[in-house]
Amino acid sequence: MKTPASLESLITALRVLPGVGPKTAQRMAYHLMQRDPGGADRLARAIDHARSHLKHCARCNTFSETELCVLCADDQRRQDVLCVVEMPADALMIEQTHSYDGLYFVLMGKVSPLDGLTARDIPLEQLARRALDGTVNEVILATNFTAEGEATAHVLATLFKDRGLSVSRIARGLPVGGELEHVDAGTLAQALYERRRLSTGDA
């Protein structure tokens, strides 16, 4: 039996989600159409609303509905420490540790040579402007301990070499190959606390 074109289009669209293969996308599509049509409507409206209202924070590059996100607009946060993460979910995980009160910069990506993603695919110029605006004394590199995260940290360390900033890397208490969003709060808090300063030779 041939799948209707509109249903096939929905299945294909759902496959853009990370970790969703053909079978999972098919199950999702059937569920939305048969068992939860109201949910399908809410999902469509929520996606449309998010696309219409979300933009990037002018300072940290995370998603925000205003020019500055909630954290960047909070003058009670430390202004002299900047933690660089790959994705908004990573910053959220660090916030949940309640062990960091500085600010963030979200790359919205990473360096991944195998995927054809180079340093030109992350906002290095915007990050440099933010880190070198005169208020930041320390940059914490909190990219994942994956091959891509390490490559990204190397690029960032090179960027800030000889710029007069203290550059540190979160400690290797995190498992090799581990991603921040999957690490428990206690382990992540300890990794932040035990962060090591990078020397010129590390860049």
Curated annotation (Swiss-Prot):
CDD domains: TOPRIM_recR (cd01025). Transmembrane segments: none annotated. Gene3D superfamilies: 3.40.1360.10, RecR Domain 1. The keyword Ligase does not apply. InterPro entries: DNA_Rcmb_RecR, Rcmb_RecR, Rcmb_RecR_Znf, TOPRIM_dom, TOPRIM_RecR. Keywords: DNA damage, DNA recombination, DNA repair, Metal-binding, Zinc, Zinc-finger. Residues 80-175 form the Toprim domain. The keyword DNA damage applies. SMART domains: TOPRIM. A zinc finger (C4-type) spans 57-72. It holds the Pfam family RecR_ZnF. May play a role in DNA repair. It seems to be involved in an RecBC-independent recombinational process of DNA repair. It may act with RecF and RecO. Belongs to the RecR family. This is Recombination protein RecR. It comes from Laribacter hongkongensis (strain HLHK9).
